[in-house]
């Protein structure tokens, strides 16, 4: 079964309450994918995602964490900290995006097919794909497809 690493923004947007048009659209796509499409995938997340969600405003974080209660956690493999540091050292991720580097390292090291996120600045960013491919090739790691829920909704979904 195809594997998907669930990054922090997915459960966060599922419970998002802001009403801007973009946020409303992302929330709807997240809920549609989670409620209908996720069953076709093997889902994983991490302690990093749970820790980030735990920092969310009261109520939202606990609801987002509850959404992940049955999702297995990926553990840190040997070399995890080195891979995370390598991404930052080689400017794939800025120094203040250590959590994003951790999500990417976990998804890569565990050979995830997809990394699902709404973080289009640091993760689902087409401008970073080639750079990530080069770095992961040097490390002997596969490159997960980094995408948003919109891209994993089947074309025949009504």
Predicted regions and their residues:
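Short, well-structured N-terminal submotif of metal-dependent ribonuclease cores
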Residues: 1-45, 54-63, 89-95, 129-132, ...
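Acidic, PIN/NYN-like endoribonuclease modules and their adjacent C-terminal/linker elements
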Residues: 3, 17-21, 26-27, 110-158
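Short secondary-structure boundary segments
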Residues: 8, 47, 118-120
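Residues at the C-termini of beta-strands that transition into short coil/loop
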Residues: 47, 77-78, 149-150
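Active-site neighborhoods of divalent-metal-dependent phosphate/nucleic-acid chemistry enzymes
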Residues: 72-130, 153, 158
């Amino acid at each position: 079964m195809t594997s998907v690493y669930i990054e922090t923004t997915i459960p966060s947007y599922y419970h998002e309450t802001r009403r801007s048009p973009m946020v409303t659209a992302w929330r709807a796509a997240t809920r549609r994918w989670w409620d209908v499409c996720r069953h076709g995938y093997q889902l994983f997340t991490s302690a990093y995602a749970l820790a980030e969600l735990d920092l969310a405003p009261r109520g939202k974080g606990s609801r987002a964490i509850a959404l992940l209660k049955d999702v297995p956690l990926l553990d840190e493999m040997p070399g995890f900290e080195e891979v995370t540091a390598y991404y930052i050292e080689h400017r794939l991720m800025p120094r203040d995006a250590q959590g994003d580097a951790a999500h990417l390292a976990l998804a890569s090291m565990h050979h995830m097919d997809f990394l699902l996120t709404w973080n289009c600045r640091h993760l689902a960013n087409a401008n970073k794909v080639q750079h990530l491919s080069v770095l992961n090739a040097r490390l002997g790691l596969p490159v997960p497809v980094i995408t948003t829920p919109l891209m994993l909704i089947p074309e025949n979904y009504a």
